[in-house]
Amino acid sequence: MSRASSQQASPTSQTFDPSDLSTYTLDVLHHYPLVDLLQQLNAIPNDLKIPDTYSKVEQAARINVLRAICVGFAEVRRHNDNRTLQRSTMFAVNDAASRIRPSIGLKRTFPTGIFSTTIHGSPSDDDISTS
């Protein structure tokens, strides 16, 4: 017997749409580079509403796929620790969740104005200028 001809489109013809849960399949996601997935996931609006057409089990399964992708990103980061800047203790290097916490792009940044600001007119400046 032959299979039914109503098969889904081939994975390469399907596109990943973060707002459409039906595109959260490994067949589709496998063909996207990590950078493209990150950019598309970061572009999801904060107030995105998922239609009620999906069952709770299906929604939970798709959320688990997304979590697996996130853990995969953390694993890629962990395997490349020797090729990037070392993580600082500020980001809890040795806690229980450090293995799955992504730290891509995290840096210690301080506004330069805090450390380079000089205050003119302080009492010490007045003492120097009058002597």
UniProtKB/Swiss-Prot annotation:
Keywords per UniProt: Capsid protein, Host nucleus, Virion
Broad class of the protein's primary localization: virion
One CC-aspect GO term: host cell nucleus
Classification via Pfam families: Herpes_UL35
GO terms for biological process, alphabetical: viral process
Subcellular location: Virion; Host nucleus
Top-level taxon of origin: Viruses
Membership in a protein family: Belongs to the herpesviridae small capsomere-interacting protein family.
HAMAP family: HSV_SCP_alphahv
Assembly, per entry: Interacts with the major capsid protein/MCP.
Annotated function: Participates in the assembly of the infectious particles by decorating the outer surface of the capsid shell and thus forming a layer between the capsid and the tegument. Complexes composed of the major capsid protein and small capsomere-interacting protein/SCP assemble together in the host cytoplasm and are translocated to the nucleus, where they accumulate and participate in capsid assembly.
The name this protein goes by in its record: Small capsomere-interacting protein
Annotated organism of origin: Gallid herpesvirus 2 (strain Chicken/Md5/ATCC VR-987)
Gene giving rise to this polypeptide: SCP
